[in-house]
Amino acid sequence: MSTQAGWRVRAAVGADTQALLALRLALWPDADDGVAELQAALAQADASHLLVVDDADVALGFAEVSVRHDYVNGTESTPVGFLEGWYVSPAWRGRGLGRALVAAAVEWTREQGCAELASDARLDDSGAQAAHAACGFEPTERVVYYRLQLA
């Protein structure tokens, strides 16, 4: 995986659960995954959890990538790698950590035999859209999801 002065990207392991939970909560404040769910996810063969850590092995950011066999908006092949989420602690942004996480996700996705890596961002999150563009992602579709309450 990637190594730079002061930090490196590596695969997350069971001992990283608490650090990964804290980073996930920073990205997804409403997430309710617990330790058991995350440990089970770390053991899945069709998903990868990546951490970027400093020289003292303190987690600075993460990426979660999976293989999806269902239709993924804007893609032309199956299966497709999907960057479920990626996050770098604010104090470490602008130093290439996000790009390194995406590069590691690309490498893992290729190893799974996928021809495409997809991701998503909220329509109102211009920062996430800019980060995706900076890493080479191209926008494909913009959708609005609806629901009808039945009960």
Per-segment meaning from a language model:
Residues 99, 111, 123-142:
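Conserved active-site alpha-helix within GNAT-family acetyltransferase domains
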Residues 17, 21-35, 71:
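Helix-loop element at the rim of GNAT/NAT acetyltransferase active sites that forms part
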Residues 70-83, 93, 141:
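A conserved beta-turn-beta hairpin within the catalytic core of GNAT-like acetyltransferases
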Residues 31-51, 64, 70:
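Active-site rim helix/loop that mediates acceptor-substrate recognition in acyltransferases
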Residues 7-20:
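A short beta-loop-alpha structural element at the N-terminal edge
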Residues 109-121:
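Conserved GNAT acetyl-CoA-binding A-motif
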Residues 88, 94-107, 130-134:
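Conserved acetyl-CoA-binding loop-helix of GNAT-fold acetyltransferases
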